[in-house]
């Protein structure tokens, strides 16, 4: 099996090194990741300049682009052999609920949908790497197990891992996405020349984080697995349009 590994924390981040080390003796792994932190890049592509891959001393490929750029190039000619699956992470920080809309970690896995199989995105609920060994072990076990799982084509598994030692992980739960409350207001700053700017505030707290959600699972010490799909069509809203379009044109 050939696995393409990417992330949004950057090619030198400890999470991607831990993920590669965990999977390298299970599959043929290649790493293509951004040359700098691209957290919050979502599914953006770089269209205003060329992308320049650079192979580092450890064999990882660094790219001056987004996580989606990395996987896009990896699936479309940069590599000699097309990967069989995409695995993203290990992100230092949660990707729960609405986070999946902005997450470069999840976006990298979503770009892997063109392979037709299942892609996986891993996140650890900590900005510190202390429990990366836990996350790496769980990532390996789930990558090994996913071949036995029959899912619809182009499914992405969004996996969040509590910031705990392995012996304190209570198990794994299948969850739905929760929802966050609105974020706080941006922080206004003024540079020495008097020019105003803003720092985006941190994500809001869980507004819908009850039992069954990804928020609830990880807070209870469980690994959360949420199956995602690209189709965001709001099918239940269709009936509300009955008669509304008549006479619009």
Swiss-Prot record:
Keywords: Cytoplasm, Hydrolase, Metal-binding, Nucleotide-binding. GO terms for cellular component: cytoplasm. It is found in: Cytoplasm. The keyword Ubl conjugation does not apply. Its main location: cytoplasm. It catalyses: a ribonucleoside 5'-phosphate + H2O = a ribonucleoside + phosphate. GO terms for molecular function: 3'-nucleotidase activity; 5'-nucleotidase activity; exopolyphosphatase activity; metal ion binding; nucleotide binding. It comes from the Bacteria. InterPro entries: SurE, SurE-like_Pase/nucleotidase, SurE-like_sf. Pfam families: SurE. The keyword Secreted does not apply. Its cofactor is a divalent metal cation. Gene3D superfamilies: Survival protein SurE-like phosphatase/nucleotidase. A divalent metal cation binds at residues 8-9, 39, 91. Its EC number is 3.1.3.5. Nucleotidase that shows phosphatase activity on nucleoside 5'-monophosphates. Belongs to the SurE nucleotidase family. This is 5'-nucleotidase SurE. The lineage of its organism: Bacteria, Pseudomonadati, Pseudomonadota, Gammaproteobacteria, Pseudomonadales.
